[in-house]
């Protein structure tokens, strides 16, 4: 099966530039605001997590971006809850990670949110792997990853909506 390259439209270029601007904005915000809130420099994992969250919600339409943002937040909230309870009781380790992923997968399935299982599992793995590096502050990891996710989702959706609105307002086409 041969794949035919698509022609790029002006919107495709705007979309690409908007995504690049979005990643720059969330990077700068994360590295600037995190030290003000935590009194420590932003950690690479936090910066990366915020950028990933912003990129994840950057979709072809505003509605798809909002839907992706809600999925990202739901998966992160389930992971946050399970990881926080676990880390308050036990040290982070691979066995605990596997158990939490199994429990969370079952909870997401029962809630009818199978599409978010992958997001939940990735988030849980990141939280527990990073928590294992520094056991004294392991319980903080769920809070930090939740904050990074909220920041990334907010910036990603906001930038997508602004660019989409402005482009289609100026071009006279219906907003996507």
Protein language model annotation of sequence segments:
Residues 1-122, 126-176:
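Alpha-helical transmembrane segments and their membrane-interface boundaries
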